[in-house]
Swiss-Prot record:
It is found in: Vacuole. The active site is at S77 (nucleophile), D215 (proton acceptor). This is Patatin-16. It comes from Solanum tuberosum (Potato). The nitrogen atoms of the two glycine residues in the GGXR motif define the oxyanion hole, and stabilize the oxyanion that forms during the nucleophilic attack by the catalytic serine during substrate cleavage. One of its GO terms (molecular function) is nutrient reservoir activity.
Amino acid sequence: MATTKSFLILIVMILATTSSTFASLEEMVTVLSIDGGGIKGIIPGTILEFLEGQLQKMDNNADARLADYFDVIGGTSTGGLLTAMITTPNENNRPFAAANEIVPFYFEHGPHIFNSSTGQFFRKYDGKYLMQVLQEKLGETRVHQALTEVAISSFDIKTNKPVIFTKSNLAKSPELDAKMYDICYSTAAAPTYFPPHYFATNTINGDKYELNLVDGAVATVADPALLSVSVATRRAQEDPAFASIRSLNYKKMLLLSLGTGTTSEFDKTHTAEETAKWGALQWMLVIQQMTEAASSYMTDYYLSTVFQDLHSQNNYLRVQENPLTGTTTKADDASEANMELLAQVGENLLKKPVSKDNPETYEEALKRFAKLLSDRKKLRANKASY
């Protein structure tokens, strides 16, 4: 009798634990962040194709798309373009691009976007083809129509302030309900590469609202993960679906951050004696790369530390190639040979360990992540059906 009673208690405990686990997963807020990096967007594009393919297999649904699984998708520069591609609706109110269309997009349009014959002395490219293809693909779609929350950064050079385009901010700032093609060009308009972008919208009172924007990396550097997280936490104050992460409860967050590779240049060491002899030109050649790489490392370090301190390290995954070499380091080398190399970098990255301390490969980690995303979606769908 005592044995039977103990067995029943054990069953109840298991059921209670399982129920708690499911409830916890259902409450999770999911965030995807995509770095900037020009043509190197092929690398996260390859990763996204793998992840979406896994979700389609798990849910036995060839029409499954990343926007169905993430509450917030954020990006800067080329990451902002990828964000728009997988969240902007087509005529059927589904993302106009599947993840497996991202890499072919770069191969088709990259050589025309980064065509040196269109450049001028003070910038490398005129940006006309980039704007043309953005208008063609994104049409008249505006921020409010995105299929999930987005976070795309840019920087206004007239006001010297970052401009962040999100759905949740439109109630307070309706003038930021801009056309997606204007936003995508702006976040990609890296100084010395493309011209800054001017356009105007209207305020709630009908007044003209002018924007003079450049690359989002000026505002958030290349890694927009903290921006994407902050958009999610801010939305938690108003949206019940995000309530679980109020008070910065990162235990209730799943964060996937995709990089475009670090450069070998940053791995070169310099001594104080050597750099003391440098002039402005020598510093200019390396300081931007050093600053961007250091900031990206610090973002990853901060997020890793926070999730580890909360014993939730499996809730955060940073996918990054360290380091790139040769032509793959260039943000604007859209030669077919280099794009093939970048695609191979992405494929090879899947087989590499997550870190020195974690032998799990990125492929295994992404499959685990996909399982969490799939299970969470099913739990929410079941709850909604009652």
